[in-house]
Swiss-Prot record:
Full protein name: ATP-dependent zinc metalloprotease FtsH 1
Localization in the cell: Cell membrane
Keywords linked to the UniProt accession: ATP-binding, Cell membrane, Hydrolase, Membrane, Metal-binding, Metalloprotease, Nucleotide-binding, Protease, Transmembrane, Transmembrane helix, Zinc
Gene name of this polypeptide: ftsH1
Spans traversing the lipid bilayer: 9-29, 131-151
Cofactor: Zn(2+)
Organism: Phytoplasma mali (strain AT)
Annotated residues for binding of Zn(2+): H437, H441, D513
InterPro entries referenced in this protein's UniProt entry, alphabetically: AAA+_ATPase, AAA_lid_3, ATPase_AAA_core, ATPase_AAA_CS, FtsH, P-loop_NTPase, Peptidase_M41, Peptidase_M41-like
Cofactor note: Binds 1 zinc ion per subunit.
Amino acid sequence: MKTHYFKKIFNLKFLVIFFSILFCILLILDLTFERRIKGIKKRTDEIIKKIKDDNHLVEEIVFYETNSTIFEKSFYRVEILVKNKNNLTTKEKWYAVVDSIFFHEIHSLIKGRENIQIKDPKTDFHLSELILSLVPIVSSTIFMFYIISNIKKSSGKLNSNAKVSAKQKSLFTFKDVAGNTEEKEEMTELIDFLKQPQKYETIGAAIPKGVLLEGPPGTGKTLLAKALAGEASVPFYAVSGSEFVEMYVGVGASRVRTLFKEAKLNAPCVLFIDEIDVLGGKRGGNSSGGNQEKDQTLNQLLTEMDGFTQAKGIIVIGATNRADMLDAALLRPGRFDRKILVNLPDIKSRAEILKLHAQNKKLSSDIDFHQLAQQTPGMSGAQLAAVLNEASILTVRNHKDFITMTELSEALDRVLMGPAKKSIKYDPEERRMVAYHEAGHAVIGIKLKHAQKVQKITIIPRGNAGGYNLMMPEKETFFSSRKRMLAQIQSFLGGRVAEELVFDDISSGAFDDFRQATKIARLMVTKYGMSDLGVSQDSEFSDKKLIDTAIKKIIDNCYARTKHLMLENKTLLDQIAHLLLEQETITQAEIEQLVVNTKK
C-alpha cells in the first residue's frame, strides 16, 4: 500500500507541479536577494554619508554574518539605529547587505566614538537560505528517482512490446471465413493437434511447429490464423514483424524470448506473426549494426522454434506476401513445416465473401452476388468488403433504405478507379475524343476472340482517367497464353487507334495504355520466351538492343492488326461512341444490343 502510494505521488504530473512551484520559490528568493545585492553600493554610500553627517547620532550598529549559497561568499547584514539631533525622540533603523570591505570600513570610520555601540558579528539564520541550500539536494534526489523508475519501465516496454492477449480467446471460427476452401482444410487438421496433442505423441508423430501463409494482401491470412485459434479454443497471440525492429541492440532478440516465454506459460496456443519477412528476411554478409541486430533477432526466433529450447504446444503461424525474401533456415522442416498458399478468391469464393459481408446489411431483393462476383476478378476479400462498405455509405448518402445494384456498381467503380469527378467539364471536341477512345477499347474487346469482354463503359472522369472500360475475362484461368497476351496488348492499343482513324490526331490519354502494353510485351520477350529471341530469359549479359527490337516488333504487329480490325468495325465504333456521348455510361446489356443491331 505504501509503495503504491509512493509511486502515485511521484508520477509525472505531480513532479511537473512540484518542480514548477519549487522553481517559482527559488526565483522569488533569488530575485529578492539580487535586489538587495544590487542596492549595496547605494546603501553603503548612503550609510557612510549619514554616519559622517552631524545631524544624526548613531546609537548602535549590529552586524549579522550571512553565508550565501549562491555567491559562495560571506556577506553581512548591517542594522544601524540612529537619532536625529533636531528631534531626539525620533529613531530610525537603517539596514543593508554589505561585504567584508564595508564591514572593515565601518569599523575604521567609527573607531574611537564612544557613543556608538558596535556588537560582534552574529550568525544570521534565514529560512530562505536554508531552502536555497536544500533545493539542489531535494531536486536531484527526486529527479534521479524519476529517471531510474522510467528506465525500468522503458526497459520492460522494450523487452516486451508485443500485443499479447493470452487471457482472451479468438472469437472467429472458420464459419467467419468465406472461400479459401482448401486452405481451411489444411488448417482444420491443426485444430486436432492443439486439442489432443497426446494422440499424436503416443504414435511418435511430431506436431507441426509452424505454418507459413503466403499470398497477396487482403486474402484473409490473418483471419485464418484467428479462426484456427477460435476453433481450437486456445489463446491467440498476434504480433507484427516490425515490432521486433528497434534502434537498440539486443531488444529484438529480447522481445522474441519474452514473447515465447509468455506463450509457453499459456500453451497450447497460436502465435501469429504478420509480415514475417521483416523479421525473417535473408541474412547477408553485411556486418553493419542494423544487420547484426536483425540477424540476432532472427537467430533467436530460429532457436525458439527449433533449437536447444523447443517451444512445445505452440503453433507459430507466419504471414507474408514475400516468401522469396525469407531466410532458408526459417523455411526448413522443423520450423515452418507447412506452407499454405492463400490465393485470390475465384468466382465462387468471391460470391461467398460478398454474401458473408452482406449479412449485416439491408439489401434490395434484386441483388445478384454471382453477377457482382463476375465483375470482380482479381479482387481480394478485403477489396470485396470495401465494395460493400462503399455501397452502404452511398445508400445513406442517397437517402435510401436498401442497397441496390446501382449503389454496388458505383461502389465497385470507386474501389477500382476512385470517385467520379463530375465537376470536370470537357470541351466538346475533347469529350468526343474521349468517347471514341473508350469505344476503341470496347470494339477490340467485342470482336477479338481472346480479349477480355466489356462489362461497362463510361466517359465520366475517375482518378487520373478521363473514362474507362470495365473488361473481364469470359472465364477465369490460372495462366496466360501467347494469344491472350497479344489480345490484351491489342485491347490497350484500341483507344489510340480509334483516335488516329477518326480525328487523324492522337492525345496523351493513351499514355497509361502504352505503358501497360509495353509491360506485357517485355514480359513476353524477357520472361516467357514468346518472341523471336527464343526461350532464353533476360539477364545482365543480354543484348538490350535486341530485347528492345523484339518488344517494338510485338507492339508494331499488334498495332497493325488493331488498326485493321477497327477499320472493319467502324460502324460499331461510331455507334458506341455516339451512345456514350448521349448517356456517358453504357452497361453490358446495352453493348450487346448495339452489337446485335449492327449485324442486322
